[in-house]
């Protein structure tokens, strides 16, 4: 595996790969890689000839009181994990390489409406930071495909919208959620969960699973279901941020006759903010 720190060197390596007729897949990450990230890499490998992974802890998508400085930097372990699965390229730029004029002067990419709801409501500016850095990475790498995990469903939907609106020639591929044995979605932020909280940290997944059961049983009073699901999270000792039943494409509140819906939620533990989601196709119901 070759590691690059500079934009020009990445472009040269990928240009050579394309001259050899190879297709390129891209997996953007913030590092601290775990099995779910590696699953995305393997998924990309099954679809293209060459896979490049980026590791960049993007300050632009962290809020004023968020954990940018605490976010785990594990580049040596990350590099070893990627090499072990025969990843072709690792792009590991620093902030000066990505934002040479400083973040305040950086041109921003904003996806209206979708970025201000759900996680965007409690993390203002977060998705603006995501779409800005991802659009920049797409321009650097120019991949044929890019793989994003479904766990960050709102991010996935926003990236799809951005690619569609800006006519970026990349296919967005969704990677399934990888879960721990008890259903907790794998996340780099799981390392912030305290040992005391960990046995019940799957409560968000359990509440969304309960929500799914109610909907499959025919219940369509979505606001009442959302309130009940949040109550279940509170009863387990955690603080819900939101539980929302949404149209899978637009992220707008789902109508009772919507056939493709996604159940999204976020909750706070003492040390972490966790997100999860489940999607339903009600066409056969």
UniProtKB/Swiss-Prot annotation:
Catalytic reaction equation(s): (R)-pantoate + beta-alanine + ATP = (R)-pantothenate + AMP + diphosphate + H(+)
EC number: 6.3.2.1
UniProt entry keywords in alphabetical sequence: ATP-binding, Cytoplasm, Ligase, Nucleotide-binding, Pantothenate biosynthesis
Gene3D superfamilies named in the record: HUPs, Pantoate-beta-alanine ligase, C-terminal domain
Active site: 37 (proton donor)
Residues given in the record as ATP binding sites: 30-37, 149-152, 178, 186-189
Sites where the protein binds (R)-pantoate: 61, 155
Biological process according to GO: pantothenate biosynthetic process
Pathway: Cofactor biosynthesis; (R)-pantothenate biosynthesis; (R)-pantothenate from (R)-pantoate and beta-alanine: step 1/1
InterPro entries: Pantoate_ligase, Pantoate_ligase_C, Rossmann-like_a/b/a_fold
SUPFAM superfamilies cross-referenced by the UniProt entry: Nucleotidylyl transferase (SSF52374)
Compartments where located: Cytoplasm
GO CC, alphabetical: cytosol
Residues annotated as binding beta-alanine: 61
MF terms in GO: ATP binding; pantoate-beta-alanine ligase activity
Similarity comment: Belongs to the pantothenate synthetase family.
Role this protein plays: Catalyzes the condensation of pantoate with beta-alanine in an ATP-dependent reaction via a pantoyl-adenylate intermediate.
HAMAP family: PanC
Subunit structure: Homodimer.
Miscellaneous field: The reaction proceeds by a bi uni uni bi ping pong mechanism.
UniProt protein name: Pantothenate synthetase
């Amino acid at each position: 595996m070759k590691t690059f720190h500079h934009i020009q060197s990445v472009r040269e390596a990928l240009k050579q790969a394309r001259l050899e007729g190879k297709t390129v897949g891209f997996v953007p990450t913030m590092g601290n890689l775990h099995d779910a990230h590696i699953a995305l890499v393997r998924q990309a490998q099954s679809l293209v000839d060459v896979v490049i992974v980026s590791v960049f802890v993007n300050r632009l998508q962290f809020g004023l009181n968020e954990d940018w400085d605490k976010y785990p930097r594990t580049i040596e372990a990350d590099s070893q994990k990627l090499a072990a699965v025969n990843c072709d390229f690792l792009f590991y730029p620093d902030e000066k390489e990505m934002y040479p004029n400083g973040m305040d002067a950086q041109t921003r990419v904003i996806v209206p409406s979708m970025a201000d709801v759900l996680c965007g409501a409690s993390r203002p500016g977060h998705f603006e930071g995501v779409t800005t850095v991802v659009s920049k990475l797409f321009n650097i790498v120019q991949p044929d495909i890019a793989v994003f995990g479904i766990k960050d469903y709102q991010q996935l939907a926003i990236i799809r919208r951005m690619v569609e609106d800006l006519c970026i020639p990349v296919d967005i591929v969704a990677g399934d959620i990888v879960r721990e044995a008890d259903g907790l979605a794998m996340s780099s932020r799981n390392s912030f969960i305290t040992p005391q909280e960990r046995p019940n940290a799957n409560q968000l997944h359990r509440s969304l699973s309960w929500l799914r059961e109610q909907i499959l049983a025919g219940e369509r009073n979505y606001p009442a279901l959302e309130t009940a699901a949040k109550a279940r999270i509170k009863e387990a000792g955690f603080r819900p941020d939101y539980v929302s039943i949404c149209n899978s494409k637009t992220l707008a509140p789902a109508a009772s006759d919507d056939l493709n819906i996604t159940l999204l939620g976020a909750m706070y533990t003492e040390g972490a903010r966790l997100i999860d989601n489940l999607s339903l196709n009600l066409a056969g119901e």
